[in-house]
């Protein structure tokens, strides 16, 4: 079901589970909230027994499926406003504990969200560890800096070893923050969340989502 958050940002939500184990906010990839994420919200709510909400990363903008204008729009995004939307999505779930999971650009925002105590556990799928040069702006702070200021130990990073957005030196820097890193040796960027991508690897994707579920649910057994 689509809703509008208090900020005016669109989101997709499923709170149909009677007694959810926790809440889960999803930060989509650069191609925005779309049927892929509507389906993911419903599926994870059902299969993971969670209340789930995915948030539009480009609120109030009309961007087509072409990637070029989306890349061009990223520098105008504001970290504080994006985190506000993630918090509002968490509030909409009505659960005591809330986790965060994101993909690609959304995975980058997962790293940045380590500064927020609102999320008990975080899982970043192939998020950019350093902001690409074309995305840099005064409103985009470096993920590594925010991880250093926040709680990197609550973050799980799912990384493809052949992903050009997460080169080995960046992954080493990510590990140095205390972030928990799982690498898939043959995987490229975007290998897990969209089965239509050429880079999709079904076995690695299944393993990554299993690890992520276990990681997120670990928050429900940890001390507050």
Segments (PLM) and residue ranges:
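Gly/Ala-rich beta-loop-alpha elbow adjacent to hydrolase catalytic centers
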Residues: 102-106, 110
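Conserved alpha/beta-hydrolase "acid-adjacent" motif
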Residues: 164-173
């Amino acid at each position: 079901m689509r809703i509008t958050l208090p900020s005016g940002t669109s989101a997709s939500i499923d709170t149909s589970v009677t007694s959810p184990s926790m809440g889960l906010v999803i930060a989509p990839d650069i191609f925005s909230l779309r049927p892929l994420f509507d389906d993911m919200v419903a599926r994870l709510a059902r299969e993971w027994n969670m209340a789930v909400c995915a948030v539009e990363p480009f609120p109030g903008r009309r961007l087509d499926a072409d990637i070029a204008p989306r890349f061009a729009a990223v520098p105008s995004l504001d970290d504080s406003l994006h985190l506000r939307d993630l918090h509002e999505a968490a509030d909409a779930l009505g659960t005591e504990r809330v986790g965060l999971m994101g993909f690609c650009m959304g995975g980058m925002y997962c790293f940045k969200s380590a500064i927020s105590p609102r999320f008990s556990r975080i899982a970043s799928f192939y998020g950019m560890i350093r902001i690409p040069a074309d995305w840099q702006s005064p409103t985009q702070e470096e993920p590594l800096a925010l991880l250093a200021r926040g709680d990197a130990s609550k973050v799980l990073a799912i990384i493809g070893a052949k992903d050009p957005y997460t080169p080995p030196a960046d992954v080493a820097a990510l590990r140095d923050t205390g972030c928990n890193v799982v690498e898939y040796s043959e995987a490229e960027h975007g290998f897990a969340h969209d089965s239509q991508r050429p880079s999709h690897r079904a076995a690695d994707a299944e393993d990554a989502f299993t690890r992520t579920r276990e990681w997120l649910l670990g928050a429900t057994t940890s001390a507050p």
